[in-house]
A protein has these predicted regions:
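Helix-to-loop junction immediately C-terminal to a conserved catalytic motif
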Residues: 24
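Conserved ABC ATPase signature
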Residues: 109-113, 117
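Conserved catalytic motifs of ABC-family nucleotide-binding domains
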Residues: 130
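Conserved ABC transporter NBD signature motif
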Residues: 32-40
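Conserved ABC ATPase "signature" region
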Residues: 86-104
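ABC ATPase NBD coupling module
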Residues: 41-55
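Catalytic Walker B motif of ABC-type/P-loop ATPase nucleotide-binding domains
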Residues: 134-137
Length: 194
């Protein structure tokens, strides 16, 4: 459902990251089909799906280290077929500021930012190309409790203000309690949806 915040929970080895990788089009399922808006992903084409429909936030941020936060966002804006405004720099600054990265920090190399700041840049990069879905794999796993709370607020903002659907793999009860829906896995099997 569009504009909702989902968490995927389960013990280590239960298949959470594998499920996320499959629905994000990064891995191929062994059987069955994955549908996006009623269309089979195999027929849509994974390249088009990944380029225009989804953004991914990894636990390790995966930012381009020799670029600034701003440049990481601008690059993401060019890597899509979706409509991006002509004033990319201003939009990128505004997006970063919305997520708590002031202009002076946006102009720093991402390696000079704290872990929480890098994660904010990674989230901004994920939505910069005007996608519908945001997938995140343990996005708060390396962060302290206060920063984890700030990242959760950003995910809520993505759903409430931007209308994005957010799907997060997590071990954190704090993250799962603040999501709209919880999907529980165990040993590769769906055990519960709340």
């Amino acid at each position: 459902e569009q504009g909702q915040f989902y968490t995927i929970l389960g013990p280590s080895g239960s298949g959470k990251t594998t499920l996320l990788s499959i629905i994000a089009g990064l891995d191929k399922q062994e059987s069955g089909k994955i549908y996006y808006e009623g269309d089979d992903l195999d027929k849509i084409g994974l390249y088009k799906y990944r380029r225009n429909k989804i953004g991914i936030v990894f636990q390790q941020y995966n930012l381009i280290s020799y670029l600034t936060g701003l440049e990481n966002i601008e690059l993401a804006m060019t890597e899509t077929d979706n409509a991006i405004p002509k004033n990319q720099k201003e939009v990128a600054y505004a997006l970063l500021e919305k997520f708590g990265i002031v202009k002076s920090k946006a102009d720093r190399l991402v390696t000079k930012l704290s872990g929480g700041e890098q994660q904010r840049v990674a989230i901004a990069r994920a939505i910069a190309s005007n996608v519908d879905l945001i997938f995140a794999d343990e996005p708060t796993g390396n962060l302290d409790t206060a920063t984890e709370q700030e990242i959760i607020k950003i995910f809520r903002m993505l759903t409430e203000e931007f209308g994005k659907t957010v799907i997060v793999v997590t071990h954190s009860n704090v993250v799962s309690e603040l999501s709209d829906h919880r999907v529980v896995l165990n040993e590769g099997q769906l055990k519960d949806i709340q």
